[in-house]
Every structure is written in C-alpha cells, then in structure tokens.
Amino acid sequence: MEIRTATMADLPAIAQLEAVCFPAAEAATEASFARRLEAYPNHFWVLINGETIVSFVNGLVTNEPDLQDDMYDNAALHDENGAWQMIFGVDTHPDYRRQGCAGKLLEHVIRQAKAQGRKGLVLTCKDKLVPYYAKFGFLSEGISQSTHGDVIWYQMRLTL
C-alpha cells in the first residue's frame, strides 16, 4: 500500500468512501471535497491498495488553535503558513479497518506537520475514539464547541 496526495480524479472514490464511513448528517459532500482539493491538495492524503483508495485523511492549515465547524466547508480559511494542521476526517473502508491503515496515514500526516514546522495537529472525534487517537500522542481537551452533525465531539490535540 502506498500513500500519496489526492487528486481531482480521486473525488468520486473519496465521496463514496465518506458515505460509507459517516452518516449523512456528518459526511462531507463531494462538492466540499472538491473545494478542499482545490484549496489545499497537499493536505489531502490517500492510502492506496493497488488502484483502490482504502483510507484518507484531510484538513486545512490555520493559525486558529481550535477546530471550528465553518472550517469544514470554507476552504478559503486555509493558510498554508498556519501553525495548526486540522484533521477533518480519518476515513477507512470497513474491509480495511483494524489493519493499521488509518494509523499509517496518521503517522504520515504527523511527520508532514513536523517537517513543515507546525505547532501541532487538531481533530475532533466521538468519545469512543479518544483512546485510539491518544495512542498517537493526541490529548483530549474535552468536549468540543463543534455541533457538526448534531453530535458530541471531543477535541484532540497533538502538540509537536
């Protein structure tokens, strides 16, 4: 399996994988992914098995220290020189879960953020995933201000 940055040609497969991984109220749309790919293609990574995208991670870079709901759909908030790498989604196809795919991608993104001199990475997750992200050094900051999808999210931060 290999990691590379996503391209517009990947858009249909990315949108399809998102629909498999998240309920409609939480899932990003294909149009939102297109805006993200246009604005920050170097911050959208896919894990490929042969020709198949099995996992992806994406998110903008900003000087804002906390992940905010408007960041998901407003790609113009990306600041390539920003201090914080936001992580909007860690999607892995169900057939590839519990095989280290998401971890491989997260480790890659963390290395990229270090190499780019970021202060760290921020993501939000459901409570059941807090221990998973803690394995990578993320610390829980408690319940996020996010109301995305009418779900309770926990903000996690990895300071580099």
Model regions: which residues?
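Hydrophobic adenine-recognition pocket in adenosine-nucleotide-binding enzymes
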Residues: A6, V90-T92
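Conserved acyl-donor/pantetheine-binding loop and adjacent beta-alpha core of acyl/acetyltransferases
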Residues: F56-V90, R97, T147-W153
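Active-site rim helix/loop that mediates acceptor-substrate recognition in acyltransferases
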Residues: A24-G50, N58-L77
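Conserved acetyl-CoA pyrophosphate-binding loop and the N-cap/start of the following alpha-helix
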Residues: Y96-H108
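Conserved catalytic-core motifs of GNAT/GCN5-like acyltransferases
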Residues: V61-E64, T124, A134, L139-Q155
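Residue-level recognition of the GNAT/N-acetyltransferase active site
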Residues: H93, K126
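Conserved GNAT acetyl-CoA-binding A-motif
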Residues: L106, R111-C125
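A short beta-loop-alpha structural element at the N-terminal edge
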Residues: M1-I14
